Design a protein with these regions (language model features):
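Glycine- and acidic-residue-biased ligand/ion/polar-headgroup-sensing regions
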Residues: 61-79
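Short beta-strand His + acidic residue motifs that chelate non-heme Fe in jelly-roll/DSBH
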Residues: 55-57, 75-76, 95-97, 102-108, ...
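Double-stranded beta-helix
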Residues: 108-152
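Conserved short histidine dyad/triad with adjacent acidic residue
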Residues: 44-61
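Flexible, glycine-rich phosphate/dinucleotide-binding loops
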Residues: 74, 82, 122
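Short acidic-glycine-tyrosine-enriched beta hairpin
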Residues: 79-100
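A short, N-terminal "cap"/entry segment at the start of jelly-roll beta-barrel domains
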Residues: 1-41, 55, 87, 145-152
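Short, surface-exposed charged micro-motifs
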Residues: 65, 86, 104
Length: 152
């Protein structure tokens, strides 16, 4: 049988419960989301021309996987011992974030990150702010991060 997939229209995808959601965030990032009826989905995030932190948060049900396509990110989290830590991820690297792990991401200028969100996320909003982690991560400027992670 010849491989000849049929294109699916946005209207047909919408009937299947698939939603498109495109936003520009306050930090200049552009996010292009594809979300299923169960709340799981994919997001392609384009960093702005200036590196910036996102907003610290956690999920009660969702697992997220961040994949660095280009550029680099700093991934911050509060671990199970309640310690704040930062990790540098470069092109081709990824991190998996489990439910209830408070996390944040600093995206380098013009970076591209893919995020996959899965789990039982169809019970309403599953995004909860983490002021404690914001206080920690947002105290680091891009210059500070360069000093901490010399190999950037």
């Amino acid at each position: 049988m010849k491989f000849c997939p049929k294109k699916i229209s946005i209207e047909e995808a919408t009937k299947d419960g698939i939603k498109l959601n495109f936003d520009q965030m306050n930090n200049g990032e552009k996010r292009y989301r594809l979300v299923g009826p169960d709340g799981s989905g994919y997001c392609r995030t384009l960093g702005s021309n200036k590196g910036a932190w996102q907003n610290s948060h956690y999920h009660k049900a969702a697992t997220e996987i961040y994949i660095v396509q280009s550029g680099w990110i700093i991934y911050g989290e509060i671990d199970h011992s309640k310690n704040c830590k930062l990790n540098y991820l470069k092109e081709g690297q990824s991190v998996t974030v489990l439910p209830f792990v408070h996390h944040n991401v600093f995206m380098s200028p013009n970076s591209v990150v893919h995020t996959v969100k899965c789990g039982e996320t169809d019970r309403g909003a599953d995004w909860f702010p983490s002021e404690e982690l914001d206080d920690y991560t947002k105290s680091f400027s891009e210059e500070d991060l360069f000093k901490l992670f010399v190999n950037i």
